[in-house]
Amino acid sequence: IFIQVILPLRLEWEPFYYQEIELSESAGDASGLFPVTSTGSVTERDKEQVRVGDRVRVNFAGKEYVGVVSMADAGKQAEEMGIVDKVKPILGMAEGLEPVTKEEIELWRHIAEYYLCTVGEVYKAAYPAQKVEKEVVQARQEALKVEREEKNRTKIADKIKRLEERAEKKAELAAKARKSESRERYLAEKEMLEGEIGLLVRELTSMVGELCRTTGSVTGYGDSVTYHQDEEPIGGSIIETSEGTEKEISLSAAQEEAYSKIKEIFAKGKPALLHGVTGSGKTEIYLKLAQETLAMGKNVLYLVPEIALSRQLEDRISETFPELLVFHSGETMSRKREVATVLRHAGEPAEGKGYVVLGTRSAIFLPHKNLGLVIVDEEHDTSYKQDSPAPRYNGRETAIMMAKIFGANVILGSATPSLESLYNCSVGRYGLVTLNKRFYDAADSDIEIIDTIAERRKNGMIGNFSRKLIEHIGKCLGEHRQVLILRERRAYSPIVQCQECGEIPKCRCCNVSLSLHRRAEGSERLVCHYCGRVYEYTGKCHKCGGELKPLGSGTQKIEEEASKLFPNARIARLDSDTAQSRKYETDTIRKFSNGEIDILIGTRMVAKGFDFSGLSLVAVLQADSILGQEDYRADERGLQLLEQFRGRCGRRGEKGLFVIQTSQPEHPVYQSIDGKLDENGTMARFLGERKLFGYPPYSRVIGVVIKDYNQARVDLLSRDLGEYLRGALAVKVSLAPGVQNGPNVIGPYSPAIDKISNQNIRQIRVLLPKDRSLARNK
């Protein structure tokens, strides 16, 4: 029986294989090839035959892979191609691996066509662990990690016990001591021991919390984690549960109106874009739609751009729905496999039971069944886009593709919608619904733009803080309110420079300056933010021996300055350095939400869709670093970030204050912050600029990146490739601005950072008309 198989490789074709079948007597004298249907009932004749979606073990180029059967009746094709004698047999079925659904394969093909990659690359992204043996080994490694943590916990507990005994002994000696000097010495030693005990107790508490997070909901941990088709779904251990039944969701009049409009858009078979100002109650509308979908026995996929947002939403959603599945990269491999198993074994709509799956973009690749609703929250967020490796897909666009396959409804939501989504609304592809009022009828936050150049001239700056901002923060703290500060640069200082020769230390492997980082104990080091290499920092120039001076300020320095200005405030920092520990990130957000932190300083990760009830002041320091990026979307994304950040404050009926410190107070982006991002205002200007120069949404853009360790070779290759593309696409050279009637090729050119990890980088940008077919593009 000839079949075609999708392999997790970058192949433009799907290799042919054959399966040998022993026919039963009821098959008669049938001989030769006969096709295997992808649908239909199992008979005595074909019960051993593979079907579309089955996982099979095959040999390709001397290596064994697990592939997915994409065609099970390929005998005719193999004969036409004249390869019957060259086809290899399959090695067998991939035991313990569930079949792939036909909807999954269809989605993979759409993604491969749209994002110019192969189906095999999409399969590899959807199922990264391809071998049963590998999965079992990974589970065993996780089990060994748990065992090590258990041993460490036992050691620490024993040490605490010994220290407590020593502390008790010191207390007894102090009580018996006749001389005051001896008594004081014993008491001092007791305090030292108690301090050490306190540190160990905190460490032990942290370890226990991490252990519970890792293993608390996994049953049979360390056993084989592969699942057979006849297994019962194991949903209980990985479903977030809350006591009681589903809560009734009550909407305000404005929300009810928006909800009704969304239902009308769904009835027309279109995606809906919910453009609601921050704090307008978009989440309640999502949950109401989800509740209605679950009542029909269908599943809901709720996508968020970041893991941190997923964690904050878990409690909120589980309050409404007793059952919730969570899927993102922060979950263990075992938990992720269990989520997939639950969805595979989900009942039919008639059974009246559905699931809500909360996850990041990777949740799109789950084996969904009976999908009724897809929610894409913060649809503008760049985190939905995967840059590398292939498939370089956009989670928002892919979710819409998937919804079409399942016939599911789609709702996109944001306070700052993307230009592409607004454009799709203007041409009738999407339906637009707006929420202009905040849920608690709070007025929009006041905006104050502070000119840092003018402030410095009149001695109005203390470090990175203007005196005006210091006054606002002091007033806020005096009223027991919270402050959120955004600085879009981590580290202590972005660069250091020699005061004698002007040398700026750069990474040896990247064409980028090194950033100065300070550790908790006070030591300093230089770090490359692109390749991660770390260099010793001596404070002396390696060229002339002159003194190196830190220039600029990152979040570490801002935290240091804030601690000096407000010594009694509880201050924390949240950036990609501190958030390397998921526990620290979660704890920091929780503490700030609970009012245990007064001032939170961070990068753009603090500007996401968090809901902090006690926050009344948000400030952006050195805001100009957000703008001026090497991208035609720089102003759009800068405005979105600032609007999102502004929306963090004043969310509980109290008016907030948004402060921007900038050296360019007249910049159009700052003057456009008004909470009214729509197709008729600022976004209309952005769309006009895009149309003038032929950029999306009026065209499709393909970015071609060429990398090589040899600079001369990458220059030659990129130049030749650029000329080849111009010839292949029949590009007409024109110096006049405006939308060209045909394709256009820009470059090759060097990006701002043209060398990373010793690889020289060149780029080519290809602009294609939107009416050009995807197959022709590929």
Q: Model-flagged regions — what are they?
A:
Residues 246-252, 256-259, 268-355, 359-715, ...:
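Inter-lobe coupling/hinge segments of SF2-like helicase ATPases
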Residues 482, 689-776:
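Long, largely alpha-helical accessory region at the distal end of helicase-like NTP-driven motors
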Residues 215, 562, 645-649, 721, ...:
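Hydrophobic, Leu/Ile/Phe/Ala-enriched alpha-helical segments that form helix-helix packing faces
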Residues 117-121, 132, 482, 568-571, ...:
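Intrinsically disordered or highly flexible coil/loop and linker segments, enriched in small
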Residues 1-411, 426-442, 728, 737, ...:
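Accessory, non-ATPase domains that flank or precede helicase/AAA+ motor cores in DNA-metabolism machines
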